[in-house]
């Protein structure tokens, strides 16, 4: 019987890292990743390096992503909402997508308060990922909990989850044989298993839909 695997996805980190690595020079939206496809490819990559007793199946995918506000970019806001709806369709109870509004500086133009697009940035997504990682590791519903992110600020969350949780805590990363920086891992108190995902896994994770 396969082990139950839950995956916490730091979406922009996973998406943009893959875009830079495998599709340099292309618009990031061409490298859009479908979370369930990604988790399935992660399971496939992990299973290829484990024996029959340690095979996993995707049981839950928690996705956290920044969301442009409509006052700044109504088209991007609409696309993000459409993507969330598409990614969760058919995966009720398995895939959850949490969109957190981006943070902005504001300015007044002709007396109207407007967001400064160049100032927008994700805030709090890493905290949400950390909290979910620990919760999933502790809840007792999953055998394996994987963090998909290269954000080193999440190392303490991995340590906490591994130390206090009931599940086996792991990480996932993109790997390219020609890029030395992809050979490393997030440094934690004790070495955690990290599944390396390749360009083929990336291509099989892509969302084929056009949200324009």
Functional labels for PLM-detected ranges:
Residues 1-118, 168:
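Domain-level signal for Mg2+-assisted phosphodiester chemistry and nucleotide/NA-binding surfaces
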Residues 96-212:
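Nuclease catalytic cores that cleave nucleic-acid phosphodiester bonds
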């Amino acid at each position: 019987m396969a082990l139950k695997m839950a995956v916490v996805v730091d979406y922009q980190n996973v998406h943009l890292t893959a875009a830079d690595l495998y599709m340099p020079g292309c618009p990031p939206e061409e490298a859009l990743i479908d979370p369930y496809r990604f988790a399935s490819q992660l399971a496939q990559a992990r299973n290829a390096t484990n024996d029959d007793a340690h095979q996993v199946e995707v049981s839950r995918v928690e996705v956290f992503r920044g969301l442009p506000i409509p006052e700044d970019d109504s088209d991007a806001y609409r696309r993000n909402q459409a993507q969330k709806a598409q990614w969760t369709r058919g995966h009720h109870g398995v895939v959850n997508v949490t969109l957190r509004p981006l943070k902005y500086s504001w300015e007044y133009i002709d007396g109207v308060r407007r967001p400064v697009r160049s100032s927008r940035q994700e805030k709090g997504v890493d905290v949400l990922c950390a909290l979910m990682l620990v919760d999933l590791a502790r809840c007792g519903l999953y055998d394996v909990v994987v963090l998909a992110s290269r954000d080193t600020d999440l190392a303490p969350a991995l340590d906490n989850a591994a130390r206090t949780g009931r599940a086996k805590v792991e990480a996932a990363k993109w790997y390219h044989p020609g890029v030395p920086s992809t050979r490393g891992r997030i440094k934690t108190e004790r070495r955690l298993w990290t599944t390396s995902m390749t360009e083929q896994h990336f291509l099989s994770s892509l969302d084929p839909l056009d949200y324009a």
